[in-house]
Every structure is written in structure tokens, then in C-alpha cells.
From Swiss-Prot:
Residues 496-534 form a propeptide. Residues 1-32 form the signal peptide. It is found in: Secreted, Cell wall; Fimbrium. InterPro entries: Fim_isopep_form_D2_dom (IPR026466), FM1-like (IPR048052), GramPos_pilinD1_N (IPR032364), Ig-like_fold (IPR013783), LPXTG_anchor (IPR019931), Sgo0707-like_N2 (IPR046473), SpaA_PFL_dom_1 (IPR041033). The modification Pentaglycyl murein peptidoglycan amidated threonine is found at T495. A motif (LPXTG sorting signal) lies at residues 492-496. Keywords: Cell wall, Fimbrium, Peptidoglycan-anchor, Secreted, Signal. It holds the Pfam family SpaA. One of its GO terms (cellular component) is pilus. This is Fimbrial subunit type 2. Major fimbrial subunit of A.naeslundii. It is a peptidoglycan-anchor.
Length: 534
């Protein structure tokens, strides 16, 4: 059945044209009460094509017939968004009265911004809904389509949104058909209507604080600043919840979050946010006072620093990512904060950052020991320093700064086996930034080991400073073996085998002297007797 009524057409053009201005991104000139409309085919089935983009330059990006008007100014397409079209009861587009009702919905506040607050039960004053039709998810180009739509008026709600979209599109009403009254359009009825709702996106970033600020050895902290730039929300759009969430590696102990700031100003725990810890998972969840500050500071940087103390090395790579879990709603007044979902679908997640560590074992041995497996020496004392050239290809024993400390101690002593194990020494991290004490993906880092005291009875070596090369991972860096030689001491009383040998030799010499003396005496006596006989 077809209707061809001039009054009907004018009301339709005026109502539908005005109604969809914000959704379609059309300028006010798009409405034309004297449109050259054609017949409405009430038996036809139409479609709604949704083009979903981030907010761009604020100018219209397309027309109801699908022609683009501002390709350069539109924001990036948004995939993964789903829309539902709810058929409105009580609006008959076959009558002038029906189009008058559509026209009334163009009045300010006629379509509440929170009409879709509960997608399962949308609300529209003075109207109910008959049935609904759901689009597929928007594709990589930001497009989705609802097909086979009868000639009706529909409330359209954004009913599924990716986690990185902080502000949904406002609900809107669309008619099938729609008068094609845009500039340079032909004024006919469009049964395949295109709309261009927009979103506000939010992102989250993570880095690693320069390790020089926190130490280079086991017991030092690794700190991960997590930040987001706050979007501008509509006046009657409010945060339902806003949370930073970070699950830290098991090799980090005493995990927590500190230094929560907004635009560089510190926020207060309890007053502005709640700190939660569940095992290795740490959350910073903003309360009503904090959410109000977030809404009131668009464009400002919100940051929290997650941290833990290094206890061991494992494979050498301590990886970390964080999530931002947030949502908004349209309301007349700020709603009470809701509890963020524990496992939301695809929340904004930071890129992975990595802090790399290695370990070091040294063994002090007796340099005079000629056995294959030398015994360790207890009581040798060492200090360890950063190397002046930390990332030299060949490490040198030139130290930089003060000795490294563990719990305030800078001198470490060999135990019963003659060993000291440094369970973790910093190698590098994945953050490239000018001025950091770091080289991304460095294969090793140089340290300097200094022996400050030899074990009792042993001599401190002349080369007490030794260059050490530490590689990422436990047990990767070869054990360092350091010799000590015994002290020189005065001669001892000779009571052993060597003394007996000397005594024997001395006795033999005395005996030879005695025998020689006897022989000489006898020779002289015989000579004297011969002389007397003569």
C-alpha cells in the first residue's frame, strides 16, 4: 500500500530530518520542509547501516544515503560495537499524526540520554516497545547493519561496547523510511538509512621508572607508572566506575600502588580512591569523590605507580601489563559508583614492559690448594659496585658511585662454603628514553666486585677489584672463583722429618771429623817412632 499526501510528506521531512541531525552528522540546512518526497511504500523492508567512528574534528562525516562528506575529518573506525533497534509502539508512519509524534521527539530532552541505561528495558517517556532487532558487531571499518526493518520508528541503543570506549553513543530515533533532504539530495524516501554515531575512546599506557632511582640489587623495587589521559564526557554523562588494575609477577614481593596523581596533584587514598590487594593483583578504584574529579578534569593525566620488591630472578624477564576498567552512563545526577567487573571483556590494556635481572655467585678459595676441587674459604668480605661503563662490550674494573646495599648493608661475607649469592642484579629494561640508566635489550650489564677483607690467615690480593659481567636469568652468569694465598710466617722449630735429616747429616760430619783426627794422630805417632828408631 502506498500513501502520497503532501501534508504527510512535509511533516515527515521536517520531523525525520531534524530528528537525526546529531546522529547523521548533518548540518541544520539539511532539513527541508518542502522536500520533493515520493510515496511511502508501507510494505517495504528497509535497513539501518551504522558507521561507528571516534570523535573526529566535530564536523559531519556522512549523509543518510551513505555518501561521505568528510573523510579527512572523521575519527578512526571502531570495531566490536553492537546496536539494537527497538520498534516504538504508538507511532504509525502511515499517518500525519504518526509523523507529528516523531516531530515531538525532536524537542530537547524528549529522548533521555539515559534511555538505554538498561539495554534490556529501554525507556522512552509515553512509549513502549514492541520488538527489537540486533546488529552484528561493527567490523574493522566500523560498519554494522540491521536488515529487514519494517516501516516503523525505532529507538536505537548502543548495547555492546569495547572496553576502550568510555562513552557510548547517545540513544537516537530513526525512521524507516527517512526523507533524503540533505543538501543536493533528490528528496526521495530512503529505505536503506545510514547513521554515524560517535564514541569517545580511552587508552592506558605503562612504563618503568628508571632503575637508578630504586636500586640495582635484590631487595630493590621495580616501579611501573600506569597512566591515562581523561576524555571529555558530555555534561550528563558520568563514570559508573574507573579502575587501574595490575597483576604483578610472583618474583615481586610487597606489591602495592603509590603516588596516585591527577594532573600532577596527589590524590588521597580513602578520600579519592581505594587501594586493593588480592595476592599479586593490585587495584586502584576511584570512589565518588574521585570520579567527580576525573569528570571535571578532561585532558589531564591520571597516573598510579604499581611496584614490588625483587626477590629472585627466574628466567630473568619480569614482564608486566596493566588494565583500565571503566564505564559511563547518562543520568540527571551522578550515580552511586558501581563495583567494576572482575573479568571484563577486552578492557584497554597496556603494552607489555619488561625488566631484566641476572644473579651472581662468587666463591673464595685457597690459592695454595693444588687439588681439583678447592675448598671454599669462610670470612672473606666483598662489596659490589655499578661499573662506570655499565654496558661496555668488555667490562672493566672501574667502579661508579657507592657500593650497592641490601637492607642497608653494603659489605657481604662468604659463608661456610666460601660463597656469596647475589640473587638478583639489574641488567636492563624495555623502556627507551634519553637519560635513563638503561640499554634496551642489552645482553649483559657490568658490575665491579671489590674484596675488602681476606679470610684470616690469607693475603688480600693485589687486584682486589674485579670486573663482573651479569647476564639475564638465574645461573646464566658463570660462578666467579677468587683465589687467596696464605700469609708468610716466621720459621718454626724443626721437630719433624726435615730436622732429623739435618741432625743425621750433622752427626755424620762430626763422625768423619773424629775419624780423620784419629787417622792423623796415628800417622804422626808412627812417624815419630820411625824417627826414634833411626
Amino acid at each position: 500500500m502506498k500513501y502520497n499526501t503532501s501534508t504527510l510528506g512535509r511533516r515527515a521531512a521536517a520531523a525525520a530530518g531534524v530528528l537525526t541531525l546529531a546522529v547523521l552528522g548533518l548540518a541544520p540546512m539539511a532539513q527541508a520542509e518542502n522536500a520533493n518526497h515520493g510515496d511511502i511504500n508501507t510494505e517495504a523492508l528497509g535497513s539501518l547501516t551504522i558507521h561507528k567512528h571516534l570523535n573526529g574534528d566535530g564536523n559531519p562525516i556522512g549523509a543518510p544515503d551513505g555518501t561521505a562528506s568528510n573523510d579527512d575529518g572523521k575519527g578512526a573506525p571502531v570495531s566490536g560495537v553492537q546496536f539494537t533497534a527497538y520498534e516504538i509502539n504508538g507511532i504509525d508512519l502511515k499517518t500525519s499524526e504518526g509523523w507529528a509524534k516523531v516531530n515531538a521527539l525532536t524537542n530537547t530532552g524528549a529522548i533521555p540520554d539515559n534511555a538505554c541505561a538498561n539495554p534490556g528495558q529501554p525507556t522512552l517517556p509515553n512509549y513502549t516497545f514492541r520488538s527489537s532487532r540486533v546488529s552484528g558487531d561493527t567490523d574493522r571499518d566500523g560498519e554494522a547493519k540491521i536488515e529487514s526493518l519494517p516501516v516503523k520508528a525505532y529507538l536505537v541503543c548502543e548495547t555492546k561496547t569495547p572496553g576502550n570506549i568510555v562513552q557510548k553513543a547517545k540513544p537516537f530515533v530513526v525512521t524507516i523510511p527517512h526523507p533524503n533532504t540533505a543538501a543536493k539530495a533528490d528528496g526521495t524516501w530512503l529505505y536503506d538509512v545510514h547513521v554515524y554515531p560517535k564514541n569517545e575512546k580511552i587508552e592506558v599506557a605503562k612504563t618503568i621508572e628508571d632503575q637508578r632511582n630504586n636500586g640495582y640489587i635484590v631487595g630493590s623495587k621495580v616501579r611501573f607508572p600506569v597512566s591515562s589521559t581523561l576524555p571529555k564526557l558530555d555534561d550528563n554523562s558520568y563514570y559508573k566506575y574507573y579502575q587501574f588494575k595490575d597483576t604483578l609477577d610472583n618474583r615481586l614481593k610487597q606489591v602495592t600502588a603509590t603516588d596516585v596523581t591527577l594532573g600532577g596533584t596527589r590524590l588521597d587514598e580513602g578520600t579519592d580512591y581505594t587501594l586493593g590487594t588480592d595476592g599479586q593483583t593490585v587495584t586502584v578504584t576511584f570512589n565518588q569523590n574521585g570520579l567527580s574529579k576525573l569528570k571535571g578534569n578532561p585532558g589531564q593525566k591520571l597516573q598510579a605507580v604499581f611496584e614490588g620488591v625483587v626477590s629472585e630472578v627466574g628466567d630473568g624477564s619480569i614482564n608486566n601489563t596493566a588494565q583500565l576498567i571503566s564505564d559511563t552512563t547518562y543520568a540527571e545526577q551522578p550515580p552511586a559508583p558501581e563495583t567494576p567487573p572482575a573479568n571484563p571483556d577486552n578492557p584497554p590494556t597496556t603494552e607489555q614492559v619488561t625488566s631484566k635481572w641476572g644473579d651472581l655467585t662468587i666463591k673464595k678459595v685457597d690459592g695454595n690448594d693444588r687439588s681439583g676441587d678447592k675448598d671454599g674459604l669462610k670470612g672473606a668480605e666483598f662489596q659490589i659496585y655499578k661499573a662506570k661503563d655499565a654496558y661496555a662490550d668488555t667490562c672493566s674494573p672501574e667502579a661508579d658511585g657507592q657500593p650497592l646495599t641490601i637492607n642497608g648493608e653494603s659489605t657481604f661475607t662468604t659463608g661456610e662454603g666460601g660463597t656469596i649469592n647475589f640473587k638478583a642484579l639489574f641488567v636492563s629494561d624495555s623502556v627507551q628514553d634519553t637519560g635513563r640508566d638503561n640499554r634496551v635489550d642489552a645482553p649483559h650489564r657490568c658490575y665491579v666486585l671489590v674484596e675488602t677483607k681476606a679470610p684470616a690467615g690469607y693475603v688480600l690480593p693485589a687486584d682486589a677489584s674485579r670486573a663482573i659481567t651479569v647476564e639475564p636469568g638465574a645461573g646464566v652468569t658463570q660462578q666467579v672463583v677468587i683465589d687467596n694465598v696464605k700469609q708468610s710466617v716466621p720459621g718454626l722449630p724443626l721437630t719433624g722429618a726435615n730436622g732429623m735429616l739435618i741432625l743425621t747429616a750433622s752427626g755424620a760430619a762430626l763422625l768423619m771429623i773424629a775419624v780423620g783426627s784419629v787417622l792423623v794422630a796415628r800417622y804422626r805417632e808412627r812417624k815419630r817412632n820411625r824417627d826414634l828408631a833411626a
